[in-house]
Amino acid sequence: KKFTVYAMICGYLHDIGKAYIPKEILTKDGPLTEEEFEVMKTHTTIGYNVCMRDLKLRPYADGPLYHHEALNGSGYPSGLTQKDIPFVARIIRVADEYDALVTPLTFIFLIH
């Protein structure tokens, strides 16, 4: 039960860094340029820093930081492989991918 609550809070916080990404990038109609994608990718480290600045959020910083890592090392921000990616981040990655598949983009843009 303890891990479930921990994972739930990490999940709630996983995209907190997007609050600091320019709205023009978050709501862009069409694919991002390489430069825009590099800016978008910073939401992971920004989210980590937000959590680390708050003692109550600090334990949950792995969710925002590692949720875009991939088992084969092709993810970001660190290019970690399976054994080095925290389990909670792997769970969030799967949930985030599922959400991206089933949530209409117009809804996503409205909440940012």
Q: Can you describe what each PLM-predicted range is?
A:
Residues 1-112:
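Histidine- and acidic-residue-rich, metal-dependent catalytic cores
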